[in-house]
C-alpha cells in the first residue's frame, strides 16, 4: 500500500523496524527539549502530514518500552488520524511516572499503525438477541 506523505521534520520517514512490525515509530520534531513533569501532558509535533485512502485510518499508539521503562504513554490511545485529516500529526503524551521526563528532538515517541476500517449502518430494533453473557460486563466473566 502506498500513502502520500509530506515530511517537514528534520528526520527520516517512519519505517518498520523489523519485517513483522505492525507499527512505524514516530519521532518528536521539536526545536528544543520538552520537560514533562509527573502527570503533565503535552502535544508533541512530528512534522508529518499524510493522505490516507478512504476506508483507512492511522492509529497513534504508545511505544511499549517508553511506557514500561519511563511511565510515558499516549493519552488518547489509540489516537486516530482520519483519512480526510490533512494537518500535522501530533502525539498527546502524558507522564504517569513520579519523575520528570525530557523529550528530545528525534526521540521515538509513539507508533503509527495503518488500519482498514468499516463504516457501520445502524439498524434500530426493539430488542437484541440473547447470549449466555447477557448484560454482564466490567469483570463479569471473572478476574482469573
UniProtKB/Swiss-Prot annotation:
Claim: Hydrolase is one of the keywords in the record: yes
Entry EC no(s): 3.6.1.23
Keyword Metal-binding attached: yes
Classification via InterPro entries: dUTPase, dUTPase-like, dUTPase-like_sf, dUTPase_trimeric
Required cofactor(s): Mg(2+)
Family: Belongs to the dUTPase family.
Function: This enzyme is involved in nucleotide metabolism: it produces dUMP, the immediate precursor of thymidine nucleotides and it decreases the intracellular concentration of dUTP so that uracil cannot be incorporated into DNA.
The protein's name in its UniProt record: Deoxyuridine 5'-triphosphate nucleotidohydrolase
Organism: Flavobacterium johnsoniae (strain ATCC 17061 / DSM 2064 / JCM 8514 / BCRC 14874 / CCUG 350202 / NBRC 14942 / NCIMB 11054 / UW101)
Lineage of the organism: Bacteria, Pseudomonadati, Bacteroidota, Flavobacteriia, Flavobacteriales
Amino acid at each position: 500500500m502506498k500513502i502520500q506523505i509530506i515530511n517537514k521534520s528534520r528526520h527520516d520517514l517512519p519505517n518498520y523496524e523489523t519485517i513483522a512490525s505492525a507499527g512505524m515509530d514516530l519521532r518528536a520534531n521539536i526545536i528544543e527539549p520538552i520537560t514533562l513533569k509527573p502527570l503533565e501532558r503535552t502535544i508533541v509535533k512530528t512534522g508529518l502530514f499524510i493522505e490516507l485512502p478512504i476506508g483507512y485510518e492511522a492509529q497513534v499508539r504508545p511505544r511499549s518500552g517508553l511506557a514500561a521503562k519511563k511511565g510515558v504513554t499516549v493519552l488518547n490511545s489509540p489516537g486516530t488520524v482520519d483519512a480526510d485529516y490533512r494537518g500535522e500529526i501530533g502525539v498527546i503524551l502524558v507522564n504517569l511516572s513520579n519523575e520528570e521526563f525530557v523529550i528530545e528532538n528525534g526521540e521515538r515517541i509513539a507508533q503509527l499503525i495503518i488500519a482498514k476500517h468499516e463504516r457501520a449502518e445502524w439498524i434500530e430494533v426493539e430488542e437484541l438477541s440473547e447470549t449466555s453473557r447477557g448484560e454482564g460486563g466490567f469483570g463479569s466473566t471473572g478476574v482469573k
